[in-house]
Design a protein with these regions (language model features):
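Basic-flanked hydrophobic alpha-helices used for secretion and membrane insertion
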Residues: 2-204
């Protein structure tokens, strides 16, 4: 298993079996589609994220690009194991706050106010916690800030999702997955990760 650590990532609680991704990583997937998925009997869990990529920011006079990503209840719950310091609850419940993901050259700290440039408008977010890790990889030199959906909407004026992830019940069939695929707008990317996940499961367990 130690050798496999270098070649495969063990499944995390947030590992998706299906993903629906908007074109050009924009915020384009309507929230009603997520609600429809949640009501599907073969869907165990469905959750969305909104992304704003490489947003210009200034903190304490230092310029830096950041990715701003929204979490909902389940994703905040999973993040508890990765909290280095600060408060998840504040980021979850207080609009205008967020969590910074740790990086070695981190110039953004708890207590800092980050000024974001969103389409020429200046918006502020206060950092209330630090995470050791998150499921996403930002470009080199780009920071990652996690916030609530309410904060994301306030800062960006976007209310649709960039990606929706789906975890299925154990009795879901290929036919069920095909039916979900048929629900997805043809402009969106539909990603089926079940085969890769099952091979990882087989290696570890």
């Amino acid at each position: 298993v130690e050798f496999m650590q270098h070649t495969l990532t063990p499944l995390h609680p947030w590992t998706a079996e299906l993903s629906i991704i908007s074109p050009d990583n924009s915020c384009a997937i309507d929230t009603t589609f997520l609600e429809d998925l949640k009501e599907n009997s073969i869907v165990d869990l469905a959750y969305g994220r909104m992304f704003a990529y490489e947003v210009p920011s200034v903190t304490n006079g230092i310029e830096k690009k950041v990715d701003l990503i929204s979490y909902e209840q389940h994703q905040f719950d999973w993040a508890k194991d990765y909290l280095l310091e600060g408060s998840l609850e504040s980021a979850q419940n207080d609009v205008g706050t967020g969590l910074i993901v740790y990086e070695q050259q981190n110039t953004i700290q708890i207590g800092d106010t980050v000024t974001l440039n969103i389409s020429g408008q200046k918006k502020e977010i206060q950092i209330v916690g630090t995470l050791s890790d998150c499921p996403f990889y930002s470009a080199a030199g780009v920071g990652t800030i996690i916030c609530s959906e309410d904060t994301f909407k306030q800062i960006t004026s976007e209310s649709k999702y960039t990606i929706i992830d789906v975890q299925l019940t154990k009795d879901a069939t290929d036919g069920d997955v095909y039916a979900i695929h048929q629900m997805v707008d043809s402009t969106f990317t539909f990603s089926d990760e079940r085969m890769g996940n099952s091979s990882t499961m087989g290696t570890y367990y």
